[in-house]
Amino acid sequence: MALQLSRFLIFFLYILAHIARSPATSPNSTFLFNSFRQSDLNLSGSATVTRTRALQMTNGQHSMEPGIKGNAFFTASLQFKKPTASKRTKSFSTRFVFTIVSKAHQSGGHGFAFIVAPSPNFSNAMGGRFFGLFSIRNNGNTRNQIFVVEFDIVQQTNLHDIDESHVGVDINGVNPSASEPAAYYTGNRKKEQGVLDSQTPIQAWIEYDGPMKQLNVTIAPLSHQLKPNCTLISRSIDLSPVLLEHMYVGFSFGTQKLVSKCYILAWSFAMDGKVPELDLSHLPLYSSGLYSSVE
């Protein structure tokens, strides 16, 4: 009897240890934040939630290498693949409102990124041009298993940036596989150039069709509340080799010599379904200056 009890206790402790090591997985594949609380997100670095319940990614300070970084992730991992032989990535979509505040007549550094990653831990990453996601040592490493859509406000010619205000798609590093200057399309399909650090709110939509292996990225100023019919980036891309079965979604920001602040004001996400609508009429307040504050 004592031997059976000992075996049961050993088995029970093994199960508990296995559960403790396993990442928390959300049973819900859809979420909506029209404002934020600290408990909503896994925050690290300079990322914080302000008194007005905006997500602030950086503190407006500057630094030399490795720079300043801020990371913010949804607290639980999401299932991006069904446990079948095909291992095909599911469809997913996200929508968010952001604003970047830089010094007048000077682009801040370096921008922010929406990311899908196997872990929310980026303690070894560098700020600046690496967005708080990568470092000189691992940039471009296929073992990173990271999908990135970057909103970049500094041109780095050595990273093949097309200009100082662009949107790009990165896989496992910060060398874009596709990028376009920041712009949106009006109702009559007229292309309007934009500036990402305009200090005014901008909407972004990122949509991935798993069966079709199609990625679409669209942006528009808040004054243009409906999603434009024309996308900014539309690319055929298979994310199945990149994404694991369970991944984390979130944002990352990096700055170095140049100063800027980035705010995420609202965010929604959906897996295999329509992304929830944001309440654009009640967005959190944010500081429109680098050194003034509503936090």
Language model segments and positions:
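Polar, low-complexity loop segments and adjacent catalytic/binding residues used for recognizing
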Residues: 2-295
